[in-house]
């Protein structure tokens, strides 16, 4: 019976859980706002981890400024992660902004615009036929 998940996927899931806990409880930085880890990709040799994050920015904060603040804590977060997980080597962590949520909202708005435009055209075409 084959394994459902490869080791890298299991490690990625565990890293996601542990990083979420670390960011929630240990990292104190007012520049971050609320951070959500949307995905973690681990290299095959488990040496590197790409951590995709989204932010709930407050006030003057932008996703770019929040990401810059988070990147300042990469070494500290990696040290805390090394204490939490049992791996021979703690992966080097790189944070990336995940814009899939923003892109999804943009696409949804475009679809809504097209539907509304189509309804307006049909309504206007129906009115023109009534007048003729």
Curated annotation (Swiss-Prot):
InterPro entries the UniProt entry points to: KH_dom-like_a/b, RbfA, RbfA_dom_sf, Ribosome-bd_factorA_CS
Q: Which HAMAP family match?
A: RbfA
Q: Name one GO molecular function term.
A: ribosomal small subunit binding
Record keywords:
Cytoplasm, Ribosome biogenesis
User: Ligase among the record's keywords?
Assistant: no
**Could you give the subunit structure recorded for this chain?**
Monomer. Binds 30S ribosomal subunits, but not 50S ribosomal subunits or 70S ribosomes.
Q: Where mainly located?
A: cytoplasm
- Species for this entry: Vibrio cholerae serotype O1 (strain ATCC 39315 / El Tor Inaba N16961)
Task: Return the PANTHER family for the record.
Answer: RIBOSOME-BINDING FACTOR A, CHLOROPLASTIC-RELATED (PTHR33515:SF1)
Q: What does this protein do?
A: One of several proteins that assist in the late maturation steps of the functional core of the 30S ribosomal subunit. Associates with free 30S ribosomal subunits (but not with 30S subunits that are part of 70S ribosomes or polysomes). Required for efficient processing of 16S rRNA. May interact with the 5'-terminal helix region of 16S rRNA.
Please give the family membership noted in the entry.
Answer: Belongs to the RbfA family.
Q: What is this protein called?
A: Ribosome-binding factor A
Subcellular localization(s) per the UniProt record: Cytoplasm
Q: Name one GO biological process term.
A: maturation of SSU-rRNA
Which Gene Ontology CC terms are recorded?
A: cytosol
